[in-house]
């Protein structure tokens, strides 16, 4: 049976509304991966379940193991929960995000968490384009609420700045990684299964190119295609 999915090109960003496992064979290679895969938690918190619907394909941390095997030539950055650290391939280092404006978080856990972790895997061609960065990032939580596990643009931009070449996010969500790439003048490939979040991502990335404070040119044309597998 032939399956179809949407492909949209906005500037240097190529976006797919599809399952990442279907798109991966179509991508020859990437330089870097920056992603926040499903946590296997069904909802963002037990405190306000009614605010968000369930996350598509949020069915366990097999996705994290898969994401770390992507052949990124430069680097791979994967956000994860602390209790999933022992289920994954050993990273080269661990980056800690300290939330300046932390909250009570998931009430099922003993402590209110002020931090989240990001795993770093070094590719064979890895180097830092600027000075060697620290392994701690201090950044406020986002107030946008486009997605239940959305990361702040400042946080993702800090990590994207450490990459070179084409950046890939197989779990794009509401498109924060793509927005960061648009702002920083980097090429981006993103995949999102949920059509609603995909549309939000497209709108945010298009807007990022149009904002006057950016040093990259706006896209001359937005292309949309329907691809068959």
Question: Residue ranges of each PLM-predicted region?
Answer:
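Conserved SAM/SAH-binding loop
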Residues: 17-22, 218-227
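Short amphipathic alpha-helical patches
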Residues: 57, 204-205, 221-228
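Core catalytic lobe of class I
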Residues: 4-189, 194-199
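Short, conserved SAM-binding/catalytic segment
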Residues: 2-3, 8-10, 202-217
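Replication-associated primase and helicase/ATPase modules
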Residues: 214, 228-229
């Amino acid at each position: 049976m032939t399956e179809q999915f949407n492909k949209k090109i906005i500037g240097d960003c190529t976006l797919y509304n599809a399952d990442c496992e279907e798109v991966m064979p179509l991508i020859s290679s990437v330089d870097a991966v920056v992603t926040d895969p499903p946590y296997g938690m069904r909802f963002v918190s037990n405190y306000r379940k009614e605010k968000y619907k369930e996350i598509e394909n949020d069915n366990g941390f097999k996705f994290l193991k898969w994401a770390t095997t992507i052949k990124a030539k430069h680097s791979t950055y994967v956000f994860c929960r602390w209790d999933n650290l022992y289920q994954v391939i050993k990273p080269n280092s661990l980056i800690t995000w300290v939330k300046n404006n932390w909250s009570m978080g998931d009430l099922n856990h003993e402590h209110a968490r002020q931090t989240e972790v990001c795993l770093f895997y070094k590719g064979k061609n890895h180097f830092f384009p600027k000075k060697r960065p620290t392994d701690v990032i201090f950044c406020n939580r986002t107030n946008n609420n486009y997605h239940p596990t959305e990361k702040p643009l400042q946080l993702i931009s800090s990590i994207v700045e450490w990459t070179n070449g084409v950046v890939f996010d197989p779990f794009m969500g509401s498109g924060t990684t793509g927005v960061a790439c648009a702002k920083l003048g980097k090429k981006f490939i993103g995949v999102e299964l949920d059509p609603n979040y995909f549309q939000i991502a497209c709108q945010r990335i298009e807007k990022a190119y149009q904002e006057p404070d950016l040093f990259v040119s706006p896209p001359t044309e937005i292309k949309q295609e329907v691809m068959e597998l």
